[in-house]
Amino acid sequence: MYLKHNTHERTSDYAEALAWIERVGYVVDGIVIDGMHTLFTLFEGYKVQMCQYHMCAIVRRKLTGNPRLPAGRELKALMASLTTSDRDCFTMAFEAWAIKWDSFLKERTVNPETGTTSYTHRRLRSAMASIRFYLPYLFTWLEVDGMPNTNNRLEGIFTDLKRNINNHSGMSRKSRERLINGFFLALGNNPQ
């Protein structure tokens, strides 16, 4: 098992981990990631799946849980269908939504103090831009046998670890690393 303690999530750490995984003889059929933009470039030679759960969470943060605009409510409903759609159906529905709301999304508001304009519905435009960026990676799991569409299983394994770290937030770095090492040692002896 590859294990490295990092204080920040960096692309170079992912590159190092992937190189180690391949060096010890594993073949990487595909990678599920949760949205770090630079990883798409780093893993360009691999089949990459954007975690559908994280995609929905990104859009939900931009729209809020209860969008007040009809365009936002429609986009929220479209995102709710993501995990049960295939690439063609979801893409067609998204493009139809974008065409329907195109002029609305281009509306601009004038700042009365400066006279400059900005997009009126910035958060909705941002949600749309995120979907456009990640769309090529949302259905890779259908092309790779056994690849999941989310990283929820892996996230679930780490729930206990995160809870323990949060419950002991005053731990020194060395103690935190010892806790993490013990977690992975136990996990390695009892794989899930």
What positions do the PLM features span?
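Inter-helix linker motif
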Residues: 45-67
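Short, surface-exposed basic-aromatic patches at helix termini and helix-loop junctions that form
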Residues: 19-24, 40-53
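An acidic- and aromatic-residue-enriched active-site/binding cleft used to recognize and process polar
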Residues: 5-8, 33-38, 53-58
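Ligand-binding grooves and catalytic loops that recognize ribose/phosphate and carbohydrate rings
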Residues: 68-72
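Active-site beta-loop-alpha junctions of metal-dependent nucleic acid enzymes
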Residues: 2-26, 30
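Acidic/histidine-rich catalytic cores and adjacent linkers
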Residues: 26-43, 73-192
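Surface-exposed beta-strand edges and their flanking turn/coil or helix-capping segments
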Residues: 14-18, 63-66, 173-176
